[in-house]
From Swiss-Prot:
Keyword terms: Electron transport, Heme, Iron, Membrane, Metal-binding, Mitochondrion, Mitochondrion inner membrane, Respiratory chain, Transmembrane, Transmembrane helix, Transport, Ubiquinone
InterPro entries: Cyt_b/b6_C, Cyt_b/b6_C_sf, Cyt_b/b6_N, Cytb/b6-like_sf, Cytochrome_b, Cytochrome_b_C_euk/bac, Cytochrome_b_N_euk/bac, Di-haem_cyt_TM
Stated name of the protein: Cytochrome b
Main location as per UniProt: mitochondrion
Record note on quaternary structure: The cytochrome bc1 complex contains 3 respiratory subunits (MT-CYB, CYC1 and UQCRFS1), 2 core proteins (UQCRC1 and UQCRC2) and probably 6 low-molecular weight proteins.
Organism: Ranodon sibiricus
Note: Heme 1 (or BL or b562) is low-potential and absorbs at about 562 nm, and heme 2 (or BH or b566) is high-potential and absorbs at about 566 nm.
Membrane in keyword set: yes
Pfam families for this protein: Cytochrom_B_C (PF00032), Cytochrome_B (PF00033)
UniProt family annotation: Belongs to the cytochrome b family.
UniProt-annotated binding residues for heme b b562: H84, H183
Keyword tRNA-binding: no
Length: 380
């Protein structure tokens, strides 16, 4: 009997093993869609970004006007630009939901997959940061100045490091040019890391909502989950199109409609909404180096989670106490996001500091303690 070509062709059999005949747990919910949605986000961002790069000029004197030119004179340039800008927001919505699902259902126990995922998060954040500088508006310029300046907190070599990143003594033409180069390069690194992420995931197979082995009950990925994913694609792309058409500037900063001016500081310097939680943690520590370390720790803490998992159960499905702590962590992160967008004054300073302390306590102490306590209760 002849085998289908998809099972014998050297290239097609890799695709077949990943997207067609892949054994998938029968009970995974729509929360497992976000990985494929992130793939679609990445493809959309690379495609729209490529067309934007064809018309963009990475020069301080013409960057802002080149973006205006794209929106006014290029055929459907306004749409490509709006989809690219709002696509970044959808990328982060999907990535945070994807991480949240991983935390809730214990997917972090696949350590290699999880750690590559955290590296991917860093890469996506770096890409979004350098991309935000490119339109060369007020918030682009001052955001770049403030965030790159944080490197001056590095002992001994901080100032040299900042000037090396800037390519001079301030954020200027050299900075913009290299940020454009980085913004073009990083998505391809993300594609490479995503392939590794999938490679390691397919070594173990997917987790499922119960957190127990599903080897006795698997389905082929196609047609069941390929159609399930397609519904997710349609919903997300429809929402992205609606936002880009009807309210394209909803998630942006009005300050970025003003060309960059090194002589005028905006009243509130803040990053895009998806970085506000980390920005709030950074601001809650009065010491510069301490703030930078806390900022890094707020993301790096994800790598620690597999090591401090104490429960005998993998998922939170049957762990009500840790479930409460998980939702407390989600609420706390939303509070930090709100605080990050507020001015540095009373009572926001205290709220930010309390939320920052709780953020780290939940991950490092409360959740492991709760897992240990639930183990004890199981013996009764």
């Amino acid at each position: 009997m002849a085998h289908p070509i998809r099972k014998t062709h050297p290239l097609l059999k890799i695709i077949n093993g990943s997207f067609v005949d892949l054994p998938t747990p029968s009970n995974i919910s729509y929360l497992w869609n976000f990985g494929s949605l992130l793939g679609i986000c990445l493809i959309t961002q690379i495609a729209t970004g490529l067309f934007l790069a064809m018309h963009y000029t990475a020069d301080t004197s013409s960057a802002f006007s080149s973006v205006v030119h794209i929106c006014r004179d290029v055929n459907y340039g306004w749409l490509v630009r709006n989809i690219h800008a709002n696509g970044a927001s959808f990328f982060f919505i999907c990535i945070y939901l994807h991480i949240g699902r991983g935390l809730y259902y214990g997917s972090y126990m696949y350590k290699e997959t999880w750690n590559i995922g955290v590296i991917l998060l860093f890469l996506v954040m770096a890409t979004a940061f350098v991309g935000y500088v490119l339109p060369w508006g007020q918030m682009s310029f001052w955001g770049a100045t403030v965030i790159t300046n944080l490197l001056s907190a590095v002992p001994y070599m901080g100032d040299s490091l900042v000037q090396w990143i800037w390519g001079g003594f301030s954020v200027d033409k050299a900075t913009l040019t290299r940020f454009f180069a980085f913004h073009f390069l990083f998505p391809f690194l993300i594609v490479g890391a995503s392939i590794l992420h999938l490679l390691f995931l397919h070594e173990t197979g997917s987790n499922n909502p119960t957190g127990i082995s599903s080897n006795t009950d698997k389905l082929p990925f196609h047609p069941y989950f390929s159609y399930k994913d397609t519904l997710g694609f349609l919903i997300m792309l429809m929402m992205l199109t609606l936002l880009s058409m009807l309210s394209p500037n909803l998630l942006g900063d009005p300050d970025n409609f003003t060309p960059a001016n090194p002589l005028v500081t905006p009243p509130h310097i803040q990053p895009e909404w998806y970085f506000l939680f980390a920005y709030a943690i950074l601001r809650s520590i009065p010491n510069k180096l301490g703030g930078v370390l806390a900022l890094l720790a707020s993301i790096m803490i994800l790598m620690l989670i597999p090591m401090i998992h104490t429960s005998k159960q993998r998922s939170l499905t049957f762990r009500p106490m840790t479930q409460f702590l998980f939702w407390l962590m989600v609420s706390n992160t939303l509070i930090l996001t709100w605080i990050g967008g507020q001015p540095v004054e009373q009572p926001f300073i205290e709220i930010g500091q309390a939320a920052s302390i709780l953020y780290f306590l939940l991950f490092i102490i409360f959740m492991p303690l709760s897992g240990w306590w639930e183990n004890k209760l199981m013996k009764w």
